[in-house]
Amino acid sequence: DKLDTDQWIQAAKAAGAKFAILTATHETGFGLWQSDVNPYCLKAVKWRDGKGDIVRDFVNSCRKYGLQPGIYIGIRWNSLLGIHNFKAEGEGEFARNRQAWYKRLCEKMVTELCTRYGDLFMIWFDGGADDPQGLGPNVEPIVNQYQPDCLFYHNVNRADLRWGGSESGSVGYPCWSSFPYPYSHSNATDGITDHNQLLAHGDPEGKFWVPAMADTPLRGYNGRHEWFWEPGDDDKAVYPLENLMEMYEKSVGRNATLMVGLTPNPEGLIPDGDVHRLQEWGNEIQRRFGTPLAQTSGKNKKKLAITFDKPQRVNYYQIQEDITEGE
């Protein structure tokens, strides 16, 4: 039993992460917690005598090392139960009953995850939670009730943030936090040919605050794109430092939040090569941006000046605005 969520979070923190999100259940339907409603969970395995709770371990590790915990819930697919793109297999009354049952199951699982682990930073529904008036469960009221300060991502009615349109770790330039809709994906956006451009750039005239995030797996180099561990993986799949810095500048540097996927190996640990690269990355971010030569601020000014005591070589300018009241 080498699984160590402390090691996961320490690796993320070394890169400069401020929050971490755990995939609590994905497309198989298997849950990484002690579920009372989903028997396909850690209760069903011999590991830790069937009493393990990786969600709890993860949340505890986040709080121990000062990262905000979030939970990722995959309900769009469930291979065990025959759910494909939210839809239960089959036709007729039997399929309709299974659909209704699956929606209630999802709501109960979300209730468990929202009520057992204290305050959460984000609830992330992979592929969304769809339309509660259609195939999707009605999860938004559950999150609102039990996690009122939590970021919600997402269903057809609401997205507190938006995907940046690719899994490249970058967004477009410019990238506005404002958006024309309070959601990022819905039936109204299906088939819109330039929707990915809208996701990548936002809309300066948008009425809704839906900031962008850029995501990518750390093991996305050399022809790979691995969100999960793959047999035969090696350090050649890990992005080089220069690629990661380019992503940082084209995501964080363009007004987006960068989210990087880490995958434990079969022993339950982040591989040594990944840990080393994350530490290198955090060090390089600090080297470039951690100690500015000078800084200034101003309000309602068209020009700002910075004066040095002696000539200085400057290779970066970092410009930010106060976004507490919008852009």
Regions found by a protein language model. Give the residues of each.
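Mature catalytic domains of secreted/periplasmic carbohydrate-active enzymes
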Residues: D1-E327
